[in-house]
Amino acid sequence: MSYPSFHSYIRTLRSLLKRKQRWLLEESTFLADLCLAYGSIAGLSDRQKHTLFLAAHFKNLGALYLDDHCLHQGFDDHKQALKEMQGLFTESAQIAREAGLQEVAVVLEQYYLRAIPADYLARVFQVINAWVSCRQRKGWRSSMGDKEALVILRQRAEMGWSDPDIVFHFIEHLCRYSSRPELIEACSISGFETAPPASGSGMERLDPWQSGPWSLSAALESDSY
């Protein structure tokens, strides 16, 4: 019997997420793609990008052990949210650790806290995840706008919840290389510079809405991983 390919392995993880809640799949797929795109911009090694890519999928696997009501409602109080969702964070990291993915587990144990993680990859993942979490719909709300998401990222940096260097480097490239009018306007209003993307730069991958709404089916068919 032949061993499954990495492509098949990822599709299995995505199938599990989809069967639980479709938005979990959408979020992990978008997050994984963005981790690869920003990882290249930030000069991460292939191993580091691979770790972030896997973390994007494993971060939601813990949801398989949550009651559905936890995935369908928001929480006004952050402490209550952490308490209700702790099972997701704990189980996701444990699944990764038991799979032998120690570096992935470290990222998943640190990224969700309102503090700058000690691990560098966790710091990178935390920032990308914060953007994705804002821009993707949840089980209990629609996606936030670009301006709202930029404000939240800036606030995280100012309050010491996320690494300021990574936050502003991410925003800089997000704003500079997007050609989507809505994001350009949000960046300008928020005081970030914008510029047309260099031909063939690949930087436009940071904004999956560049050519209209993000296509889940296209992302699922991508062999970029």
Where are these regions (language model features)?
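Juxtamembrane interface at the ends
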Residues: 69-71, 136-140
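Short, charged, surface-exposed loops that flank catalytic or proteolytic processing sites
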Residues: 77-80, 138-146
